[in-house]
Structure formats: C-alpha cells, structure tokens
Swiss-Prot record:
Subunit structure: Forms a cylinder of 14 subunits composed of two heptameric rings stacked back-to-back. Interacts with the co-chaperonin GroES.
Family: Belongs to the chaperonin (HSP60) family.
Catalytic activity from the UniProt record: ATP + H2O + a folded polypeptide = ADP + phosphate + an unfolded polypeptide
GO cellular component assignments: cytoplasm
Locations listed in the record: Cytoplasm
InterPro entries membership: Chaperonin_Cpn60_CS, Cpn60/GroEL, Cpn60/GroEL/TCP-1, GroEL-like_apical_dom_sf, GROEL-like_equatorial_sf, TCP-1-like_intermed_sf
Keywords associated with the record: ATP-binding, Chaperone, Cytoplasm, Isomerase, Nucleotide-binding
Residues that bind ATP: 30-33, 51, 87-91, 415, 479-481, 495
Role summary: Together with its co-chaperonin GroES, plays an essential role in assisting protein folding. The GroEL-GroES system forms a nano-cage that allows encapsulation of the non-native substrate proteins and provides a physical environment optimized to promote and accelerate protein folding.
NCBIfam families, per the entry: GroEL (TIGR02348), PRK00013.1 (NF000592), PRK12849.1 (NF009487), PRK12850.1 (NF009488), PRK12851.1 (NF009489)
Protein name according to UniProt: Chaperonin GroEL
GO molecular function annotations of the record: ATP binding; ATP-dependent protein folding chaperone; isomerase activity; unfolded protein binding
Pfam hit, one: Cpn60_TCP1
C-alpha cells in the first residue's frame, strides 16, 4: 500500500478551498445570458466549445491531490443536480462555492462547524418550502418555450421546437435528440404506437413505391407463441375473411407453412393480411403484447389465460384505424382501446418506473409509457460544423430536461430572483444557538450568489442590482440580456422550480459537509525519475562489418 499524506485543520481546508474555487470559477463563467464559453481540449480531434456547466466541471482534474479533492467534491454537486433535474449544474456550483467560502471563513473565526451545518440545513429546508409556494404550474406552450429558451442560453429556436414537440406527443411522450444533417433544427413525430419489428415477408407489401404494407381499419390478432401450423389459424382467418377487413398478426413468430399460406392468401386477395414478430423478449414481450392489446381493445391469445388460437373469435381481436409496416418498424395508429383502460395501464407502468432501480429498465418502461400515452418525437439538431453540433446538442438536451422539470413541479421567476424572494422565508428563522444563526445568515448571503454572478458576467455591478431587486416585490428582477428591470415572468425569464430546488439541495448538502472537514488523506505523490534512457556506457566500436560482400 502506498504511503499517505495527512493534512489537518486549516491547512487541509485551505487546500480544499483552492480546488473548489478553481473548478467553480471555470464553471461560473458560463452562467446567465451573457455567460462566456469555455474551450475544452480533447485528446484527439478539435477542441470542444461549451457553455454547459457540467461538461466544464467533468473536464477538471488538478495536479495537487488535496486541491483535487475539493474540486471533485464540487463536481459531485454539479452531477447530483444534473442527475435529479438534468439542468441547474452551473447554479448549483455557484451556490456550493458561496457556501464553502462563507462557511470556511466562519470556521476560521472559531465557530462550531457542526452547528454551522445544522443552521445551513435548517435554512435550506425553509427555502425549499418557500420555493414550492412561489412555483406556478407550467402548462401552456408559451411558458414551456420560454423555459426551454432560457435553459438553452437564450436560443429561442430551441425553446420553440421543444414546445412544439411536447404539444404533439403530450407531456408523457418520449422526445429524443439526434444529430441532424442540415443547418436547421428539425422535428419529426411518430404518432401512435411504434415498435421495432418489421413485416415477416416482403410479399405483404401493398405499396411498392414506398415499400410498406398499409392496412386500413384492420383487426389485430395478438398471440403469445410461435405459429407454424396453419390449421390453428384457419378459424380466425375464415371469420376475418367474412368480416371483409384486413388482419395484422402479432406473434412470437410466424414460420413454415403458416407464413406461406398467409402470403398466398394475401397475394390472391382472399384475406388482406400481414404478420409481424412481437416486440421485446421474455417477460418484456408479454408486457408489450398486453400494452398493444389494451391500446387496441383486444385480448392476447395465451395458453396462460386458457385461450388458444382454435377457439379465438372476432371478439378477441383488437381494432385500429390504420397500421403501417415497413422493413424495420410497425406503427399502430388510433387503437380502439378504452381510454380508462389505457389510463390505468399508464398509471401501473408509472408506478413500476418509480419502483425500479435499474436505469435500463427505467428507460424501457418510459418508452412503453410514451407509446401508450402519446407518441415519440425526434429533434434533429442542425449546425454548420461538428464542433457547433456537439455544443448545440448538449444545450438542446439541457433545455429538454428543464422543460420536463417545469411541467413536473412548475416554474419560478428566473435570473436568480426566486432565491432572493425565498429569503423572506428565513428572515425570522432562528437557530438553537449563535453558531446556528451564523449558518442561517451564511446561506442567506450564499443564495444571492447566482444573481450576483449573472450580473458580473453581464458586466454590471452586482451589489447595486441585488439591492434593487430586493427592494422590488414578486417577480420583479433584472434581465441581464437587455440590462433592464421588470417582471421576470412577463419577460419570459423562467426557471423550473425542480431545477432551482435540486441545485440548492445538492449545493447545501455537499457544501455544508465540506465545512465540517477536519482532516484530509491522500497518497503521497511519487517523484518519478527524470525521463530519458539510462547511460549506455559508450556503445563501444561496432567492429568491422566485414563480409557484407554478397548482399545485393
């Protein structure tokens, strides 16, 4: 085991503070509408230019191990805020820096660190409760677009495209961000339920120009097993032929003579039919078949519930307005399922999302949720160069997280104003002793830091602006983009309450713990020997290289 170096008390905290400030100073340069960019070196390819706080934080590693520990702890604040709300990383870093700087001054002045921490915790709880009171629900497209715009560093085109995507696929819909091929951002929406399985035979295609099989007003037969024997299918096929409607078969697989017979019937025009494999595997396949059944008002034919293909009737089949199959995907549009059943299924899946611990399962469950509740939208990010594309894509993802958070917990006035208004909640707050009161006062100063930093980045005088904002009421604040004062919500400067709350909670949690640090332990840096090869002691003569005659 390598030797360790231990630092105590002030000397440890000073080193830690250096690391905190290096990281936070780099990150906070990006805050606000007039925040600057940070250029990150990459081991290969062009450097990356970013205004995303967490991207900057992730790049920073310091040579001095004690300083690095301070930097890594603040990095954790940014990551924690990012994990919970997907945005607010820069704000969280600025808050953490303010808490640590103010807190370590108080510790150096002889205050009890544990009481300071208790004071900070008490004030945090009060401010979080007040932020919830300040929050207004965010339901209309205009507010959603404004939240997206602010999060994407005042880029209104990003805010508008996210608002449009949310309007089209609903609040529960899945919105994914991909790299586009043009200069403009594009939005494409898949309405209805789409799953990644295509037709089992190209002979099902009835639109050769687009290479798709399209069924209008079809019946859907959902089967939880392989179908290889056509005899099992005959009763259903005859009933469907009499009804004169097309049929889509969704089964674990359709093979052999069953598939051949379906193809022949389809080509002769006896029954218009198409077959597709069920999506997913194992238990997930059963769950997804059940989703399709609920969406279309059908029943899954499964031996587990005592149903077999031979006994299946038209009552067991689902209905949809249209089904489109191509080589890779199947889309079911306007299933005829009961709204109450769909809502119950959505609630059940939402409960599973809350209960699961696996990120993979959570993602798959959310996909199922979106397919049932709305649809899937894809935002294709357009840019002139690869470097710009990466930077823009990161901003779109941030803005998307922010708008989701806004829909979830509402919005508060942006630009650091919500913190200043929430201070009323702790104006009368008292701790159990003087040191706790110092902790409360310390947080009171720290929550002004985001507003101060926004003003500094905009080239203004922070103290003057903070004072003026404090004199105002409600949503009155400072618009750094236009250097004006006014109603933040009317000017469209909104922050999601969830982002604001989780930024403070992450900063207070880690910041207050850092104040209570008394010792730091790190490995002793080894002095590596100077580079270069060892002395070769004069490489003697190479002898006569005689006898090289016969070489051509």
């Amino acid at each position: 085991m390598a030797a360790k170096e231990v630092k105590f008390g002030d000397s440890a905290r000073k080193k830690m503070l250096v690391g905190v400030n290096v990281l936070a100073d780099a990150v906070k340069a990006t805050l606000g509408p007039k925040g600057r960019n940070v250029v990150l070196e990459k081991s290969f390819g062009a450097p990356t230019i970013t205004k995303d706080g967490v991207s900057v934080a992730k790049e920073i590693e310091l040579k001095d191990r004690f300083e690095n520990m301070g930097a890594q702890l603040v990095k954790d604040v940014a990551s924690k805020a990012n994990d919970e709300a997907g945005d607010g990383t820069t704000t969280a870093t600025v808050l953490a820096q303010a808490i640590v700087n103010e807190g370590l001054k108080a510790v150096a002045a002889g205050m009890n660190p544990m009481d300071l921490k208790r004071g900070i915790d008490k004030a945090t709880i009060a401010i979080v409760a007040e932020l919830k009171n300040l929050a207004k629900p965010c339901t209309d497209s205009k507010a959603i677009a404004q939240v997206g715009t602010i999060s994407a560093n005042s880029d209104s085109s990003i805010g508008d495209i996210i608002a449009e995507a949310m309007e089209r696929v609903g609040k529960e819909g899945v919105i994914t961000v991909e790299e586009g091929s043009g200069l403009e951002n594009e939005l494409s929406v898949v309405e209805g339920m789409q799953f990644d399985r295509g037709y089992l035979s190209p002979y099902f295609i009835n639109k050769p120009d687009t290479m798709v099989a399209e069924l209008d007003s079809p019946l859907l037969l959902l089967v939880d097993k392989k179908i290889s024997n056509i005899r099992e299918l005959l009763p259903v096929l005859e009933a469907v032929a009499k009804a004169g409607r097309p049929l889509l078969i969704v089964a674990e697989d359709v093979e052999g003579e069953a598939l051949a017979t379906l193809v022949v019937n389809n080509m002769r025009g006896i029954v218009k039919v198409a077959a597709v494999k069920a999506p997913g595997f194992g238990d997930r396949r059963k769950a997804m078949l059940q989703d399709i059944a609920i969406l279309t008002g059908g029943t899954v034919i499964s031996e587990e519930v005592g149903l077999s293909l031979e006994t299946a009737t038209l009552e067991h089949l689902g209905n949809a307005k249209r089904v489109v199959l191509n080589k890779e995907n199947t889309t079911i549009i306007d299933g005829a399922g009961q709204q109450a059943d769909i809502e119950a299924r959505v609630a059940q899946i939402r409960k599973q999302v809350e209960d699961t611990t696996s990120d993979y399962d959570k993602e798959k469950l959310q996909e199922r949720l979106a397919k049932l509740a709305g649809g899937v939208a894809v935002i294709k990010v357009g840019a002139g160069t690869e470097v710009e594309m990466k930077e823009k894509k990161a901003r779109v993802e941030d803005a998307l997280h922010a708008t989701r958070a806004a829909v979830e917990e509402g919005v508060v006035p942006g630009g650091g104003v919500a913190w200043v208004r929430a201070l009323q909640a702790i104006s009368e707050l008292k701790g159990e002793n003087e040191d706790q009161n110092v902790g409360i006062a310390l947080l009171r100063r720290a929550v002004e830091a985001p507003l101060r930093q926004i003003v500094t980045n905009a080239g203004g005088e922070p103290s003057v602006v903070v004072d003026k904002v404090k004199q105002g009421e409600g949503n009155y604040g400072f618009n750094a983009a236009s250097d004006t004062y006014g109603d933040m919500i009317e000017m469209g400067i909104l922050d999601p309450a969830k982002v604001t709350r989780s930024a403070l909670q992450a900063a207070a949690s880690i910041g207050s713990l850092m104040i209570t640090t008394e010792a730091m332990i790190a490995e002793v840096a080894e002095d590596k020997a100077a580079g270069g090869m060892p002395d070769m002691g004069g490489m003697g003569g190479m002898g006569g290289m005689g006898g090289m005659g016969g070489m051509m």
